[in-house]
Each structure stands twice: as structure tokens, then as C-alpha cells.
Amino acid sequence: MIILDTSIWIEHLKNNQNFFSKISKLLENGEILAVECIFGELLQGVKKESEKDIILNFWRHLPKEHYENIIIEAGEYSAKNKLLDYGIGLIDAIILMHGIKSNAKIWTLDNKFLRMIPEELRYSK
């Protein structure tokens, strides 16, 4: 499975052809894992009702994993690995923890975040 970070979702939703066809293929193959905080970030930036509907439609139909206490574990992981010192906040730590727990690759355009993702969890297209 692959977790698309907010930056990747934005490129897909903007129909950026450098990303759109690859992501569409991953979606068709059921390879995308939805993470709640990513969709929360996407919803935070909507400007039109139609954008909200598109995002919520993806949310409703994509596979998800629920992990009890994942935010607490992400906070502990962040403290242990000093992620804040590298400019990585709790949301990215939660995304990283989802990747660790589900063994999903993480695809991001955020270079700061990318450097903190263990090599085996980095998605490269």
C-alpha cells in the first residue's frame, strides 16, 4: 500500500499530468491507503463545495487502517527521534506512524519530511 502525502494529493487534484496518470493507476489498483489527518488537511484548503465533495468521495471509498493510540505513539516516536528539531510536526509524525504500522510506502514532495522517512518506507515512482 502507498500513503499519498497532502502534497501529492494536491498535485493529483490539480490534474498535474506529472502525477495524475500514476496516481490514477494506483487508485484503480486499490493501492492507496487513506490517512485521516491527510484528508483533514485537504479539507482545510477547499475553496468550493465541489472540491469538498471530491475529497470526501475519495475518503469514503479508499481503504483505511485504524490504529488505537496512533497519535500518542506518533508523539512518542517524534520525541524519541527528535522530529521537531528537523521541522517535522505531529501531523507528519502521524503519517509516518501509519506508514510504519501498515508497512505502507509514503509518497511526499516535502523534502524535510522525506529525509525523516526510513528508506524502506519511501515511495519512489
Where are the regions a protein language model picked out?
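Acidic, PIN/NYN-like endoribonuclease modules and their adjacent C-terminal/linker elements
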Residues: M1, L96, I100-K125
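A general structural signal for well-ordered alpha-helical segments in protein cores
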Residues: F20, V35, F39, K52, ...
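Acidic catalytic patch
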Residues: R60-L83
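Short, well-structured N-terminal submotif of metal-dependent ribonuclease cores
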Residues: M1-A34, Q44-L56, K125
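Alpha-helix capping/helix-boundary segments
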Residues: I8-W9, I38, I70, I95, ...
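Short active-site oxyanion
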Residues: N29-E31, H61-L62, I100-K105
